[in-house]
Amino acid sequence: MREFRLIFVLLFFLPSFAIANTEIINVETGDSNKLLTSNSVCDIELSNNSSIPLLLKPNPTIPQAAGAPQQSKYTFSVCGLKPLQKYQIRASWPAVYPSDIILNYNITHIIVEINASFYSHNESLMKRPPLVPLRLVVEPLLLGFLPKSVLPIVGFVFVIILIALICMTNLFIKHKRD
């Protein structure tokens, strides 16, 4: 019984070991013929691989000299989306790169806006923050709320609950007999 308590405590604290940031939006494509086809120039092709690794330059915490260009918005075209379908757009990046990321979506493009969100005594670091490694993922939502990549976890949890119910039923029946 002690082993089960230890396993439960370890599973309870397991999420604290996750060291990444994620920004997620759920979108629904409209009933439109403006969606890009696979013949178009695409940054993300939904039929092949809906995940792309990126290195993006964030807006600095301390602005550059007046008039210097500030580029923090990136646009990515998405092909293979189906009309009237719900999708999840997810951006993930390591926690060691503190950044504020804003995701937006229009009919054919994902817009990623990235800003550095840290403070340091090193002024050059504040003016020129390091590039942020980012993974951008687009995947369909099943039943309108469940990302496809979560299905194995849902299946595993379902099996564990089923096994627990069978064990509890057997224990209850055994306890009733005694």
Swiss-Prot record:
Residues 21-152 are lumenal. GO terms for molecular function: enzyme regulator activity; glycosyltransferase activity. InterPro entries: GPI_ManTrfase_II_coact_Pga1 (IPR019433). Residues 174-178 are cytoplasmic. Residues 1-20 form the signal peptide. Glycans are attached at residues 48-49, 106, 115, 122. Pathway: Glycolipid biosynthesis; glycosylphosphatidylinositol-anchor biosynthesis. GO terms for biological process: GPI anchor biosynthetic process. Keywords: Endoplasmic reticulum, Glycoprotein, Glycosyltransferase, GPI-anchor biosynthesis, Membrane, Signal, Transferase, Transmembrane, Transmembrane helix. GO terms for cellular component: endoplasmic reticulum membrane; glycosylphosphatidylinositol-mannosyltransferase II complex; mannosyltransferase complex. The chain crosses the membrane at residues 153-173. It is a single-pass membrane protein. It is found in: Endoplasmic reticulum membrane. The keyword Glycosyltransferase applies. It comes from the Eukaryota. The keyword Chloroplast does not apply. PANTHER family: GPI MANNOSYLTRANSFERASE 2 SUBUNIT PGA1. Part of the GPI mannosyltransferase 2 complex composed of gpi18 and C167.09. Essential component of the GPI mannosyltransferase 2 complex. Responsible for the transfer of the second mannose to the glycosylphosphatidylinositol during GPI precursor assembly. This is GPI mannosyltransferase 2 subunit C167.09.
